[in-house]
């Protein structure tokens, strides 16, 4: 058929599964008193609404943090970095039933602004959340939450603009069982339709 081109790629079909990668990997801190503080590493997390700011985490019922967050209805999402990679992984493969994760990973619990759950001081950005709904889905329960405060490490603020430079924090991501650092910037939001500014000749 003249004027039409057919391009076929060879695709292999997988069984249904979670293949949306890469993902953020975060340490979620919870508990309302020092004797109940715990950290769980979560990759099933993300933003679900801008206004009001809302996010979610999904946790298996048998995880130690599940009943803690179900009871307190709050948690803190702590972004993770290259320097925190070992602690991030360790907090995901060890149980708070058997370990004091803050102590054993040399992490510092810090008071939050709104919630009783602690911040992780070593994290560059801490997002305080209050649970508004728990949805039972299957292997995991989804904790839908409203963001009630955000705390950023002062060293990442640009003194001249006051903007928070998260790109300087060496954040890590998770993809199919492995951790990665982020690569180089390839564009910015809207760059595909941005008009090129030509300098006028003098």
Where are the model-predicted features located?
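Basic, polyanion-binding surface patches
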Residues: 6-202
């Amino acid at each position: 058929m003249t004027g039409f081109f057919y391009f076929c790629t060879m695709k292999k079909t997988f069984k249904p599964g979670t293949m949306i990668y890469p993902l953020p990997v975060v340490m979620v801190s919870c508990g309302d008193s020092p004797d109940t503080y715990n950290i769980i590493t979560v990759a099933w997390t993300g933003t679900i609404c801008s206004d009001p700011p809302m996010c979610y985490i999904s946790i298996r019922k048998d995880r130690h943090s599940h009943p803690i967050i179900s009871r307190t209805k709050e948690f803190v999402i702590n972004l993770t970095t290259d320097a925190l990679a070992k602690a991030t992984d360790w907090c995901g493969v060890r149980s708070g039933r058997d370990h004091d994760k803050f102590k054993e990973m040399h992490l510092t619990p810090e008071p939050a602004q709104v919630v009783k759950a602690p911040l992780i001081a070593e994290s560059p950005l801490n997002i305080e959340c209050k649970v508004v709904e728990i949805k039972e889905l299957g292997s995991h329960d989804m904790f839908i939450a409203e963001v009630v405060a955000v705390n950023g490490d002062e060293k990442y603020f640009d003194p001249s603009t006051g903007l928070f430079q998260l790109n300087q924090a060496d954040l890590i991501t998770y993809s199919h069982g492995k951790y990665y650092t982020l690569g180089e910037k390839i564009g910015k939001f809207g760059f595909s339709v941005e008009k090129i500014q030509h300098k006028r000749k003098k």
